[in-house]
UniProtKB/Swiss-Prot annotation:
The gene is ICR3. It comes from Arabidopsis thaliana (Mouse-ear cress). This is Interactor of constitutive active ROPs 3. InterPro entries: ICR. The keyword Coiled coil applies. Belongs to the ICR family. Residues 70-133, 231-514 form a coiled coil. Residues 63-73, 98-123 have a biased composition (Basic and acidic residues). Residues 33-44 have a biased composition (Polar residues).
Length: 564
């Protein structure tokens, strides 16, 4: 009775039954074409078991048969689009990974370049440690900057792509690096200013050096003049010494001549006195003889007597007489000679007086010459004293000149030191130029490395953005796949339920047909045909459309959610 009510009752009953019976048919038509569905075997078994039901339900409208493949194709297109998008996302992820690897390689290359630059900078530091404290500070700051850059680049490039929060810190550190580079540039500007100060000091030193060289030349000229004057004074001193020696010799000769003249004068005076005394004696004798000529005869008588006596005496007396005669003869000769001498004595006296006068005049001349020589000797002594004083002064000058020579030697040493300082300064200038050139090259390298790092960061950011986009797309695709899998699981559960219900309905229908086959064949067939009428199929189609529409709406909502 209940089965009759169900068949002959209100049209709500087939509405409840038809959608449940229509769903498995729809999904059964979808699932054989999709090879990924695991329920295809379970959907085929009821077809094998109940061919009659399928044969009964086979006559359907062509519109529903046309609509079903279109929805299936839409779902297949959605699935294929999702798969293509998943492939694209995977490709983008691989591209982003390759770009990330390239960026890491470029970063490693830039890090190597920075390490090479830092090594070069360290070598330049080792070479120019002794130049100046400023250069050491600049080199240390540069080395610290490059080490910090290299360490930060190492730290930045060793970070994984997942550490997105460190990008802000990296940007901050890049700003700090830029500030440090600006500080280095400012320190280099200060270094340039100090180099300019050094150049100004060098110019001042050059001016002082020119002044010292001018003074040295003046000292040289003065020294040459002193040497010339010294030679002249030495020549004058030798000449004066020679003249002094000649004067001494002349004085000695004059002294010897004077002594000889004095001695001869004394001798002549003695002889003159003797001649005067003789003349007096002869004059007295002559006067006596003139006054007493008898004495002369007496003398002759005495001589004759004496001779006679002597003749009578011994031979000794003869000898005495002869001696007396000789004496008398001598006396006569002496008288005669005295007379002659008296005459000659007057001449000789006059001549002697003349000679004496001449000698006195010569003596006066000699005395005057001696006085002159004494005066000249005094002059020479004064000149000699003056020369000795000049010699002392000259020795003092020589000492001063020796000091000046020492000063000149020191000046030479100072000049050599200044030349060495000039050479060192030129070397330092060349080294400073080289260091400035190297700093410029390092600046350019740093700028290039900064640009490379910025490009790498830009590429990394682009790669990160692409990776984020691809990850978002992958997440969206995975969510869509999960949603489709969830919807598929829901549909599978519903299909299982519908299979169970369809089996129950089939069993009930078979039981009803078995029970009513005896008397109600026509009515049951009619009702059965009514249930299998195109109207019921249309209702089933509408219900399946609604259900599929709801499923499609759910899929569309799930598709649109990640895009928001």
């Amino acid at each position: 009775m209940q089965t009759q009510k169900a068949r002959n009752g209100s049209p709500d009953v087939p509405k409840k039954v038809s959608p449940r019976a229509a769903r498995p048919l729809k999904i059964a038509a979808l699932e054989p074409e999709s090879s990924s569905s695991p329920i295809s075997a379970t959907n085929r078994t009821p077809k094998d078991k109940s061919p009659n039901v399928l044969n009964r339900r086979s006559p359907r409208s062509p519109v529903s048969e046309k609509k079903r493949p279109s929805r299936i194709t839409e779902l297949e297109l959605l699935v294929s689009q999702l798969q293509e998008e998943l492939k694209k996302a995977k490709d983008q992820i691989s591209v982003s990974e390759t770009s990330k690897k390239q960026a890491e390689q470029e970063a490693e290359e830039s890090r190597k370049q920075l390490q090479e630059v830092s090594s070069k900078l360290e070598e330049s530091q080792n070479q120019f440690v002794e130049t100046s404290a400023l250069e050491e500070e600049t080199d240390k700051t540069g080395s610290l900057v490059f080490q910090s850059v290299s360490q930060e680049c190492d730290w930045e490039f060793s970070a994984t792509a997942g550490e997105r929060a460190g990008l802000a810190a990296v940007a901050h550190e890049i700003r700090q690096l830029k500030l440090q580079i600006e500080m280095v540039a400012s320190s280099e500007a200060g270094h340039v200013k100090q180099a300019e100060l050094y150049n100004s000091e060098v110019q001042l030193l050059r001016g002082n050096l020119m002044d010292t060289l001018f003074h040295v030349e003046n000292f040289r000229n003065q020294l040459k003049d002193c040497e010339i004057s010294e030679a002249e004074t030495e020549a004058l001193a030798t000449e004066t010494l020679r003249q002094l020696e000649n004067a001494k010799k002349a004085v000695e000769e004059l002294k010897s001549d004077g002594t000889k003249a004095v001695e001869s004068y004394k001798k002549m005076a003695v002889e003159l006195e003797q001649s005067k005394s003789r003349m007096v004696w002869l004059e007295a004798l002559v006067n006596k003889l003139q006054n007493n000529p008898a004495d002369l005869e007496n003398h002759e008588i005495l001589l004759k007597d004496y001779e006679s006596l002597r003749r009578g005496e011994s031979n000794e007396m003869d000898e005495e007489v002869s001696s007396l005669r000789c004496e008398v003869e001598r006396l006569r000769a002496a008288l005669e000679a005295s007379d002659k001498k008296d005459q000659e004595g007057n001449v000789e006296a006059s001549s002697r007086l003349r000679i004496q006068a001449e000698l006195q005049s010569e003596l006066k001349i000699a005395k005057s010459e001696i006085d002159e020589l004494k005066a000249r000797l005094m002059d020479k002594e004064t000149e000699l004293q003056f020369i000795s004083e000049e010699r002392d002064n000259f020795s003092m000058k020589l000492m001063k000149n020796q000091k000046e020579i020492d000063v000149e030697a020191e000046l030479k040493k100072l000049r050599e030191a200044i030349e060495n300082l000039k050479a060192d300064l030129m070397d330092k200038e060349t080294e400073l130029q080289i260091v400035s050139d190297e700093n410029e090259t390092l600046k350019s390298d740093i700028h290039k490395s900064e640009t490379d790092v910025q490009d790498a960061f830009l590429k990394l950011g682009i790669a990160m953005e692409e990776a984020d986009k691809s990850s978002k797309k992958a997440v969206r695709v995975t969510e869509q796949l999960e949603a489709t899998q969830a919807s598929n699981s829901e549909m599978e559960t519903e299909l299982r339920k519908l299979k169970v219900q369809s089996n129950q309905w089939r069993k009930a229908a078979e039981a009803a047909t078995a029970m009513l086959s005896a008397g109600n064949n026509g009515k049951f067939a009619e009702n059965y045909n009514q249930t299998n009428s195109p109207y019921s199929e249309d209702i089933d189609d509408e219900l399946t459309k609604k259900k599929n529409g709801n499923v499609l709406k759910k899929i569309g909502v799930l598709w649109k959610k990640p895009q928001k």
